[in-house]
Amino acid sequence: MLDAFSRSVVSADAKTAPVGGSDLAGLRSYVRDGNKRLDAVNAITSNASCIVSDAVTGMICENTGLIQAGGNCYPNRRMAACLRDGEIVLRYISYALLAGDASVLDDRCLNGLKETYIALGVPTQSAGRAVAIMKASATAHIGETNTPGLGGKRFRKMETTQGDCAALVAEAGAYFDRVIGAIS
């Protein structure tokens, strides 16, 4: 796993040159937006259980056969495994967002995930749909476009650094799309 700093050093070392120019400008931008990045990761991790449970619920509402006898979310242990997998995927996406690099997501989460799901008989289309729902929820939390809806007292609006988070929303969205692409 390489963070933005390590990537710049490795790149400069490969060119046998000091870190400078566009690499240095990229690092300045990374540091300047660091608090926004931390707030984005905090928004995901603070709401992780809600994001995952809502995604699994949405997936099941769209395919009720998953909770019937023989379905992949029946009995309880399979449902628990589904929730656990969603939390693991979300955790690695938050790691990638914090580092500003997808290598940790690719190496430790996505490598062999589709093959594992196929071997276990997990419907990859449903898993991909759950990740798409997680993407919608997580990016709403990052971009602060989440609304109380039916959440009532459970709704939390995070205190975050002011400024445009569109780039972080897009980056997080790209990580979710990477997961969807890997399991579809």
From Swiss-Prot:
<feature type="binding site" description="covalent">
    <location>
        <position position="165"/>
    </location>
    <ligand>
        <name>(2R,3E)-phycoerythrobilin 3</name>
    </ligand>
</feature>
<dbReference type="InterPro" id="IPR009050">
    <property type="entry name" value="Globin-like_sf"/>
</dbReference>
<dbReference type="GO" id="GO:0031676">
    <property type="term" value="C:plasma membrane-derived thylakoid membrane"/>
</dbReference>
<feature type="modified residue" description="N4-methylasparagine">
    <location>
        <position position="72"/>
    </location>
</feature>
<keyword id="KW-0488">Methylation</keyword>
<dbReference type="InterPro" id="IPR038719">
    <property type="entry name" value="Phycobilisome_asu/bsu_sf"/>
</dbReference>
<keyword id="KW-0793">Thylakoid</keyword>
<keyword id="KW-0472">Membrane</keyword>
<feature type="binding site" description="covalent">
    <location>
        <position position="61"/>
    </location>
    <ligand>
        <name>(2R,3E)-phycoerythrobilin 1</name>
    </ligand>
</feature>
<dbReference type="Pfam" id="PF00502">
    <property type="entry name" value="Phycobilisome"/>
</dbReference>
<comment type="function">
    <text>Light-harvesting photosynthetic bile pigment-protein from the phycobiliprotein complex.</text>
</comment>
<comment type="subunit">
    <text>Heterodimer of an alpha and a beta chain.</text>
</comment>
<dbReference type="GO" id="GO:0030089">
    <property type="term" value="C:phycobilisome"/>
</dbReference>
<keyword id="KW-0089">Bile pigment</keyword>
<comment type="similarity">
    <text>Belongs to the phycobiliprotein family.</text>
</comment>
<feature type="binding site" description="covalent">
    <location>
        <position position="50"/>
    </location>
    <ligand>
        <name>(2R,3E)-phycoerythrobilin 1</name>
    </ligand>
</feature>
<keyword id="KW-0157">Chromophore</keyword>
<dbReference type="GO" id="GO:0015979">
    <property type="term" value="P:photosynthesis"/>
</dbReference>
<feature type="binding site" description="covalent">
    <location>
        <position position="82"/>
    </location>
    <ligand>
        <name>(2R,3E)-phycoerythrobilin 2</name>
    </ligand>
</feature>
<keyword id="KW-0042">Antenna complex</keyword>
<keyword id="KW-0605">Phycobilisome</keyword>
<dbReference type="InterPro" id="IPR012128">
    <property type="entry name" value="Phycobilisome_asu/bsu"/>
</dbReference>
<protein>
    <recommendedName>
        <fullName>C-phycoerythrin class 1 subunit beta</fullName>
    </recommendedName>
</protein>
<keyword id="KW-0813">Transport</keyword>
<keyword id="KW-0602">Photosynthesis</keyword>
<keyword id="KW-0249">Electron transport</keyword>
